[in-house]
Amino acid sequence: MDVSLPCIKIQVQTRYIEEQSNPEYQRFVFAYLITIKNLSSQTVQLMSRRWLITDADGKQTVVEGDGVVGEQPRIKANDEYTYSSGTALDTPVGVMQGQYLMIDEQGESFTVEIEPFRLAVPHVLN
């Protein structure tokens, strides 16, 4: 990341939602909880997101849109924003990765990369 850009840290927690899944019909539902930490000295705003979701068969789905969960949150300096969402896969294992497009107080846009993270039914992977 360019040192002139705000320092943004992304933390992800995932969970398999057994009660909404139906393995017999190849439907595996996962929730993810994301915390966006603004470690910079200025307020930033999340404008849009782009996800690349890949299942174990290599099927890829791109999800793009404004903000997250219907919001374009402003995150103050040294503050954080947490939200949860979910996705369904055709396989018990998959990977998500993506980007957030954000703007700083001067209206300059920058991209925050979201490193790949695993979605997996418990005990499927050793």
UniProtKB/Swiss-Prot annotation:
InterPro entries: ApaG_domain, ApaG_sf, Uncharacterised_ApaG
Pfam families in alphabetical order: DUF525
Domain of life: Bacteria
GO biological process terms held by the UniProt record: error-free translesion synthesis
Transmembrane regions: none
SUPFAM superfamilies (UniProt xref): ApaG-like
Every ApaG domain range: 2-126
Name of this chain's protein: Protein ApaG
Native source species: Vibrio cholerae serotype O1 (strain ATCC 39315 / El Tor Inaba N16961)
Originating gene: apaG
